Regions:
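N-terminal signal-anchor/signal peptide hydrophobic helix marking the start
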Residues: 6-16
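Phosphate-coordinating loops and pocket residues in cytosolic domains that bind phosphorylated ligands
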Residues: 7, 40, 53, 82-83, ...
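Hydrophobic alpha-helical transmembrane segments of membrane transport/permease proteins
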Residues: 15-66, 159-180
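Membrane-water interface segments at the C-terminal ends of transmembrane alpha-helices
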Residues: 22-29, 59, 70, 134-165, ...
Length: 314
């Protein structure tokens, strides 16, 4: 087990290095001069050149990368060009907002969709199976931004049951924070349920065809015992991987939901920074999203042996 964990950690290091180089390179190739942007339109060429020297932009790309990577390791992501705010605290505060929404949404979607997918597999080709698969297909076909607007108009504006726009932290106000979370979380849950129902159904069907399931049935075990005690654990492995992928994808792609509901999360910060050409903040957001995706998948890999111990042996 220790060897398995070490191998996964070592495999993550090249990925993190590649992500860092890619983020650094992407920002450097964006049109525009950060020094000129910081000084404004009235700046003289001499002032711009002095600012480029101060920012280290006059150095070669490899030198710039080493300086930037060294600063990042020390927790220095630079300062925002727009408001001169330190990038790391800004990105972390916005990331926590996004993470709160995404984690709650993925947890709820998993609790509903995984049992539904297992039941659909158990009742294969029945009316229940057809209804669940049809529902999953329908949920997958709905664009998230359209669904978010629909829920906002119906529950927020027409019925007036829930706050329409904005965000309140659960830590500051438990009840108010939960009310503000309902609509964005519901939007994500409805969409991701479609993916998880289909994945749980497919993996469960595959396991139910294995010999040890036939043996368990031959021993006289009830169908519910065969399903939940013997089939579910092995069937959950691929679904667990999909949950990790969904979690990572949502952390990087929640900008649409945050824009619809005006939530001050990481996705909206990235969009605003792109329009403002705030390069240090864009770079910090991209790096944070990329690293969170890598770490989420590393976490998924490390827990996978709980569902399939054969992974460690292999």
């Amino acid at each position: 087990m220790v060897r398995f964990i070490l191998s996964r950690l070592l495999m993550a290091l090249p990925t993190i290095a590649f992500v860092s180089i890619t983020v650094f390179a992407l920002i450097r190739f964006i049109p525009g001069d950060p020094a000129a942007l910081m000084l404004g339109d009235m700046a003289q060429p001499e002032q711009i050149e002095a600012m480029r020297t101060e920012l280290g932009l006059d150095k070669s790309m490899p030198q710039q990368f080493l300086i930037w990577a060294g600063n990042v390791v020390q927790g220095d992501f630079g300062r925002s060009i727009v408001n001169d705010e330190a990038v790391l605290p800004l990105v972390v505060s916005r990331f926590l907002v996004s993470a709160e929404i995404v984690v709650v949404a993925v947890l709820l979607a998993s609790l509903i969709a995984v049992p539904a997918g297992v039941i659909a597999a158990w009742k294969q080709n029945s009316l229940t199976d057809l209804a669940l698969v049809g529902t999953a297909t329908l949920l997958l076909s709905i664009p998230t931004f359209w669904l978010g607007l629909l829920l906002l108009l119906f529950f927020g504006l027409k019925l007036g049951w829930l706050p329409v726009l904005g965000y309140v932290s659960i830590g500051d106000n438990l009840v108010g924070g939960m009310l503000y979370l309902v609509l964005p979380v519901m939007t994500l849950v409805i969409h991701e349920m479609g993916v998880l129902i289909r994945m749980a159904r497919a993996s469960t069907l595959e396991v139910l065809r294995l010999d040890y399931i036939t043996h368990a049935r031959a021993k006289g075990l009830s169908e519910s015992a065969v399903l939940w005690r013997h089939a579910f654990k092995n069937a959950f492995g691929p679904t667990w991987t999909m949950i990790g992928l969904i979690l990572g994808n949502l952390l990087g792609g929640i900008a649409v939901i945050e824009t619809v509901f005006t939530i001050p999360g990481l996705g909206r910060l990235m969009v605003d920074s792109i329009f403002a050409r705030d390069y240090p903040v864009i770079q910090g957001c991209l790096l944070f999203v990329s690293l969170s995706y890598v770490l989420v998948n590393l976490f998924v890999d490390l827990l996978y042996p709980l569902f399939d111990p054969r992974v460690v042996a292999e």
